[in-house]
Amino acid sequence: AKILDTLKKHNVKATFFVVGNFIETSPDLVKRMVKEGHLVGNHTFTHPDMSEIATEEAFHQELSKLEDLYEKTTGKKMKKYYRPPQGKYSESNLKMAKEMGYHTIFWSLAYVDWYESDQPTREEALEKMVPRIHPGAIVLLHSTSATNAQVLDELLTRWEEKGYSFKRVDQLT
């Protein structure tokens, strides 16, 4: 909720790639994301290594099961944006995603923020993220990171001071 509060404060619309467990355990946050104009994309139902998923049936199930849960939760169809877990994929995955109508999205700026029990400090996060911003950056920040919730306001402020503005991925493609 703190991340959504910060985005609202800065009038920023973001893109969130969610998994099945997140929708199941935080349906109110997902509904709030939608209500506040954020884009919610597909990060698969179970967060597997997608480069290991070889069959169309298994691939389709990972994405469509999440689509169904999202629609059941929000009453809306999920937009066709997909981020492979851990950035792992195969060429056939990219083809299958495209055949399902998906835009596959990667990132250009990230840091190790995904270990919930081993979070970087505020200083480490700012040192890694502030100077590395660049035009057209797609920034990967995990919403489950306590550090990100703590530093997002300062990150956005510093980047805004450098002249940056922020868009959802569907506004870039």
Give the residues covered by each predicted segment.
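N-terminal start-of-chain detector that recognizes signal peptides
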Residues: 12-13, 110-113, 139
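Divalent metal-coordination and catalytic microenvironments
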Residues: 7, 16, 40, 82-85, ...
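Alpha-helical scaffold elements lining the catalytic groove of polysaccharide deacetylases
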Residues: 48-74, 88-135, 148-150
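Active-site beta->alpha N-cap acidic-glycine motif
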Residues: 1-80, 154, 165, 173
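Structured helix-beta-strand junction loops
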Residues: 10, 36-37, 100, 135-136, ...
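A cross-domain feature marking catalytic cores of carbohydrate-active enzymes
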Residues: 18-21, 42-44, 84-86, 108, ...
